[in-house]
Amino acid sequence: MTSSTTSSIVTRFAPSPTGFLHIGGARTALFNWLYARGRGGKMLLRIEDTDRERSTTAAIDAILDGLKWLELDWDGEVIYQYSRAARHREVAEQLLATGMAYRCYATAEELVAMREKARAEGRTRLYDGMWRDRDPKEAPEGVKPTIRLRAPLTGETMVEDQVQGRVVWQNENLDDLVLLRGDGNPTYMLAVVVDDHDMGVTHVIRGDDHLINAARQKQIYDALGWTVPSMSHIPLIHGPDGSKLSKRHGALGVDAYRAMGYLPSALRNYLVRLGWSHGDQEIFSTEEMIKAFDLPAIGRSAARFDFAKLENLNGHYIRHSDDAELVRQFEDVLNYVPNGAALKAKLNDATRAQLTQAMPSLKERAKTLLELIDGAAFIFADRPLPIDAKAAALLTPESRALIGRLHAALSAVEPWSGPATEAALRAFAEANNLKLGAVAQPLRAALTGRTTSPGIFDVLAILGRDESLGRLKDQAIA
């Protein structure tokens, strides 16, 4: 691809703010972003807020926050479709002036009767064109007209789709669609075409549930004499069983994945592989995605969402993340989880240092940030330590007596460090003719309240001398 073509690429992500940024929308945004970034182009963001009753500020904020969290930046200012209504009306009037549109005075009752008749006769064209060639002087009083496109009655409308291939519709099946409602508000179909044209969009990449819209919009482009942008309609995301994606399958907002402890880098990697492939490669850095992504490599069949695969991929990203970056992500996710505020209140320079020290071990056994938080709970626990059922079963009277002797042995360790406490524990086990595991298990239960944790020598080093000895004293029997 030459620089003369790549520099002019413009994609757009155009969500409707009637709900949060769902997982399918996030993938659409990612595909638009990758295609533009890989070709030195721009990705624009347009909020399609023409449905005034359902559009909410909260949904707009959630969409913007979701994109920022996924690190999908857009170029220029956010464009709000509703603010451009005057321009949309201007284009509708332009089509009237050229004879490519007409005023329709059909009443609501007449339209209902038309639809019922068409359905009874098995026709997909529901509007019968009653005002298409009728003299406006015959207009009934008190009826505010709509403006309809004078769509071709014969022939076919064709779109060369980069994913779906050549798609053809018979014009006899397509209505004279409404461009401007009786109240003067533009329809979605008109607004999208005008906005894409005025924004200089060269490539429309969206879900294949919009494929029928492509036929309608192509007719509007043709009526205006405008160049039709390249179209790519990507398959939807289905559940693991091939059915429509539901909430239990993963049809959640991006904010939910954030609150479940997924990393944005992992979610991006997972989403790019939903429907797109590049050989057998599964793990992609952002740079690799940008370089490799192309539209013809997107499959036509629906992708299947797999939570287990996402979780495993997230675990990979956690294990390979920088410890300091994981601490930052750890802090961030506390804003979105139950009891996160209480844990955040305990974060200070000392606990951050402990968390950073524990991270190499914690991240090896965590697939999500929530598991990371759970694994780090021993750092933030208050004395007396809460003991879970499995740990309590280990803390028998004999074990508590052993902990009392361990407390005495460890009290003599100076200076306190992982190697020093390890040497002391090994010496204690040998002197008492015990295996190290027999010492480590009750020790772990007393120090963390659990039966799983980072290595016991690491735990002692992370907690430090005073906290370690204090917790042992709480569980010991002298």
From Swiss-Prot:
Protein name (database record): Glutamate--tRNA ligase
GO biological process, alphabetically ordered: glutamyl-tRNA aminoacylation
Function noted in UniProt: Catalyzes the attachment of glutamate to tRNA(Glu) in a two-step reaction: glutamate is first activated by ATP to form Glu-AMP and then transferred to the acceptor end of tRNA(Glu).
Gene3D superfamilies associated with the record: 1.10.10.350, HUPs
Keyword field contains Cytoplasm: yes
HAMAP family per record: Glu_tRNA_synth_type1 (MF_00022)
Residues spanned by motif 'HIGH' region: 15-25
Organism: Bradyrhizobium sp. (strain ORS 278)
